Amino acid sequence: MRILILNPPHPAIGSRIPKEQLPPLGLLSIGGPLLDAGHDVTLLDAEFGPLTDSEIVERVCAHCPQLLLIGHSGSTSAHPIVCRLTLFLRERLPNLIIVYGGVFPTYHFHDILTKEPQIDFIVRGEGEATVAKLIAALENHNDLNKVDGIAFRRDEQIIETLPAPMIQDLDVYRVGWELVDLKKYSYYGGKQAVVIQFSRGCPHLCNYCGQRGFWARWRHRDPKKFAQEIVWLHRTHGVQLFNLADENPTVNKAIWQEFCEAIIAENISITIIGSTRADDIVRDADILHLYRRAGVERFLLGMENTNEATLKHIRKGSKTSTDREAIRLLRQHNILSLATWVTDFEEVRDRDFIQALKQLLYYDPDQIMSLYVTPHRWTSFYGIASERRVIQLDQTKWDYKHQVLAATHMPPWRIFLWVKLIEILLQTRPKALWRLLFQPNKASRRGMYWFTLMGRRVLVHELINFFFGDRRVKNGPTLQEFWGMPQEHQEIPLSITRK
């Protein structure tokens, strides 16, 4: 079958501000098995440019695919763009089969199939096996009810098949790297870069996380095979930077150590950045030198909040003392720390921001990223926040960088100014400037320069958009009225029983 995979353009700050793009790992992961099954597969990455709607439609029509696969890693905020593009494509290509996948459609499939008649199928959960089975069923005119992990319409009824089995062995399906020109992708200040995934899922129980349930359970690739893929990408394609897509790659100390040692044995000079938990860093204090020798240059630490009571409320499972010790240990081993701090979990006041500033200064991270809580209805936090008022009705702004919920005691502008003030104070304090200017490690210094430059661009962009661009409502619907009933009981879309 002639298949086109479309990565739609995204207006989010992370997509537009850096002026660099990373390859769409999720779509490439779907493409690999389709290529191996003998299909004619092409990927159109509309993030470059970005392409306009008309340019995308013309390119898709010129290719004239039989089937279109569409999805985006920022699936909640990208959904309106997907709907708009597929509507245009349906008008031009009435016989095109349109298949939509990702985290957001996995949970909102009923709403989407009700409101968006141009979309034919939705893939729920992991797509590597499911998409290939769906296409085989379409080609052979088999019963679609027997394809696990999909949703579709039949006789004006929405059909949801059984959950697809969770992929037990992540090395079974390969990434279709040949679908893109890897030399076009860069990150972190011009380094040729890819997104790559060692593990899926997370064993922790944070009640606001929209990813944990989607992956069902934490699983990892074979550490030696994963290392060999990195070596191949570096030596064959010149990839310098590897951005880990994992929620938590360091869950298993022995497995992660095996990966680090496999990379070290290859004697290659690469940069690895990603996310992990502070308690893993503290646990691994005796092997952090292996992290650095393997190329780990920066880890994002999801601290989420500086208040112990809030951390307990959201089931983060960490302590502020552990967070600070993790940052200290990373610095001791010349690994940069990027601390994420999320506000608006609960009703906030000025004193909460003052306390947050004091605590973040105490943490002393190299870099900081402030986010706003963004509830998903398949998480248990959604039920907690369901009666809060929504102030942002534009779904493209539900990207963690925009306020979406009203606060009783503070207007949005004051929350915004507090968040920006904290960022500025953290990044311009003498200690931070000294590290920026006199960072002894050349590679780390370059990374800090790049992050600082991006921070300046983001600050200007956010100030202009908050006061002159974004539109908020004062008496919006409740969260439940906006998104619908909670789906906590459907948080895990995969079958975890071995077949």
Curated annotation (Swiss-Prot):
Keyword Iron: yes
Residues the record lists as binding [4Fe-4S] cluster: 202, 206, 209
GO molecular function: 4 iron, 4 sulfur cluster binding; cobalamin binding; metal ion binding; oxidoreductase activity
Gene3D superfamilies given in the database record: Aldolase class I, Cobalamin-binding domain
Boundaries of every B12-binding domain copy: 9-145
Keyword entries, A-Z: 4Fe-4S, Chlorophyll biosynthesis, Cobalamin, Cobalt, Iron, Iron-sulfur, Metal-binding, Oxidoreductase, Photosynthesis, S-adenosyl-L-methionine
InterPro entries with a match to the protein in the record: Aldolase_TIM, Cobalamin-bd, Elp3/MiaA/NifB-like_rSAM, Methyltransferase_Class_B, rSAM, Tetrapyrrole_Bchl_Biosynth_MTs
Protein name, as recorded: Anaerobic magnesium-protoporphyrin IX monomethyl ester cyclase
Lineage of origin: Bacteria, Bacillati, Cyanobacteriota, Cyanophyceae, Synechococcales
The gene coding this protein: bchE
